[in-house]
């Protein structure tokens, strides 16, 4: 169907409104002696002036060519882009003054040849070192014949810059976060392994302490025969002393390893703070993209208004304005999606930080429990020393020996209780480490999704 005859109802309405705009002008300048020819001449001058004003005052570069490629309109904004005076460009062939990425023909020529809207696929450099992108629509006569092209050439340097910065930031986040998450995962695995090893140690110590308790109970039961079995009691005391010494050494080792794990947890917290800071930087870039999209929407709105005022002659320009507006809205929607992903990543990171804090607390409590166990072991060793001394003085110190034996039994029971508590705490710590490992995997998935 001939474009000039399509959608007649809509065009009639637009022409009527445009006529009212023109009538307002003609009514103010009506000459009682004027004939129809003069009126048509003034109407022609009115629309010509409106068109030229639109081209001259439009905030982006405008390039209009005739069907043969001759430049007919070239506004000052486009002169700024191309570093070429308007007077030097008018009347020249478009291929001589405006080169594009197309090799076989210029984009204005493609618009005239196809009779369709043409948009440059990739932006190109202009003499001002800016990046521009051509959008062209065909200009049609009332018969529907293409008589030229109307091109808008906006400066998209800032938009491209922001897109490149966002891409670079994606790459940085992917690299840095991946490295930090790997370290975090290793630290959590280390916590889990340490917790399992220490839990096993606690179980062994419980068995040892129960054995010591049994031995001390046997000593207490046979206190009346201590004179005849002094050597046996002395040997048992020595074994208890050796085990207490081993327990002290093991407890000190456990304290050192827990301290190292606590430092790892603190480094993980610092890493999470760094992730939060990078998320804030991404939010700032998203805000900048949203601002640019808002400004682009405003330009598209102004262009639509000017196109409505221009009536049929601005129809092609309205198509360009709608396309620019659609691009701006799509950019804003993508920015909002990325911003939501950042918010979710920050929330998950904050939860991870809380769990790490809980892990640190559990480690501190475990260190306290081990220190208490160490104190108990030292008391056991001291009590065993007293027992050994009592054995040597068995003849005159039977009552003292019995009291020392009871103290060893009580202290051993206390050590068993402390080790049992430590075993429970380490089991809880192992569960927390497993949960943290799962959370790290979730963050890694979110980062991969964000980069994609």
From Swiss-Prot:
Write out the annotated subcellular location: Cytoplasm
* Entry comment on modification after translation: Methylated by CheR.
Q: Which residues form a coiled coil?
A: none
Show the segment(s) annotated as Disordered. 229-250
Give start and end of each PAS domain: 47-121
Q: Name one GO biological process term.
A: signal transduction
Report, from the record, the phenotype seen after gene disruption: Mutants lose the chemotactic response towards arginine, but they still respond to leucine.
| Domain Methyl-accepting transducer positions | 180-416
Q: Which UniProt keywords apply?
A: Chemotaxis, Cytoplasm, Methylation, Plasmid, Transducer
Q: Matching Pfam families, A to Z?
A: MCPsignal, PAS_4
Question: Which residues fall in a compositionally biased region of kind Low complexity?
Answer: 229-239
Q: Which GO terms describe its cellular component?
A: cytoplasm; membrane
The molecular function terms in GO held by this entry are: transmembrane signaling receptor activity
Classify the source by domain of life. Archaea
Q: How does it assemble?
A: Interacts with CheW2.
Function comment: Mediates chemotaxis towards arginine. Probably transduces the signal to the histidine kinase CheA.
Family in the record: Belongs to the methyl-accepting chemotaxis (MCP) protein family.
| Designated name of the protein | Transducer protein Car
What organism is recorded for this protein?
Halobacterium salinarum (strain ATCC 29341 / DSM 671 / R1)
Which lineage ranks, top first, belong to the organism behind this chain? Archaea, Methanobacteriati, Methanobacteriota, Stenosarchaea group, Halobacteria
């Amino acid at each position: 169907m001939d474009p000039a005859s399509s959608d007649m109802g809509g065009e009639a309405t637009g022409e009527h409104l445009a006529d009212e705009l023109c009538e307002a002008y003609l009514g103010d300048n009506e000459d009682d002696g004027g004939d129809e020819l003069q009126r048509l001449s003034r109407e022609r001058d009115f629309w010509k002036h409106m068109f030229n004003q639109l081209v001259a005052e439009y905030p982006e570069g405008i390039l209009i060519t005739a069907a043969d490629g001759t430049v007919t309109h070239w506004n000052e904004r486009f002169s700024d882009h191309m570093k070429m005076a308007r007077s030097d460009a008018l009347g020249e062939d478009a291929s001589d003054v405006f080169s594009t990425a197309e090799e076989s023909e210029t984009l204005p020529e493609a618009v005239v040849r196809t009779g369709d809207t043409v948009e440059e696929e990739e932006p190109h450099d202009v003499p001002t070192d800016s990046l521009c992108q051509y959008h062209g629509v065909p200009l049609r006569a009332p018969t529907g014949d293409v008589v030229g092209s109307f091109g808008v050439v906006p400066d998209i340097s800032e938009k491209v810059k922001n897109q490149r910065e966002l891409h670079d930031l994606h790459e940085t986040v992917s690299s840095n976060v991946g490295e930090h998450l790997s370290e975090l995962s290793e630290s959590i695995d280390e916590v889990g392994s340490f917790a399992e090893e220490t839990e096993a140690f606690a179980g062994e110590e419980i068995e040892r302490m129960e054995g010591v308790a049994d031995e001390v109970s046997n000593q207490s039961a046979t206190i009346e025969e201590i004179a005849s079995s002094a050597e046996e009691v002395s040997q048992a005391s020595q074994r208890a002393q050796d085990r207490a010494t081993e327990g002290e050494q093991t407890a000190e080792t456990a304290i050192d390893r827990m301290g190292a794990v606590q430092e790892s947890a603190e480094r993980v917290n610092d890493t999470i703070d760094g992730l939060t800071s990078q998320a804030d930087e991404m939010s700032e870039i998203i805000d900048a993209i949203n601002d640019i999209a808002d400004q682009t929407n405003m330009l598209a709105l102004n262009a639509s208004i000017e196109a409505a005022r221009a009536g049929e002659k601005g129809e092609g320009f309205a198509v360009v304005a709608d396309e620019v507006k659609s691009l701006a809205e799509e950019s804003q929607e993508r920015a909002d999606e990325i911003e939501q992903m950042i918010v979710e990543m920050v929330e998950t990171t904050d939860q991870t930080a809380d769990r790490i804090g809980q892990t640190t607390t559990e480690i501190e409590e475990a260190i306290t429990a081990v220190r208490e166990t160490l104190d108990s072991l030292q008391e056991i060793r001291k009590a065993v020393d007293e027992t050994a001394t009592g054995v040597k003085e068995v003849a005159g110190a039977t009552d003292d020996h019995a009291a020392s034996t009871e103290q060893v039994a009580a202290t051993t029971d206390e050590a068993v209780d402390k080790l049992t508590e430590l075993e429970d705490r380490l089991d809880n710590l192992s569960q927390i480490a497993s949960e943290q490992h799962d959370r790290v995997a979730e963050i890694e998935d979110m980062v991969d999704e964000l980069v994609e």
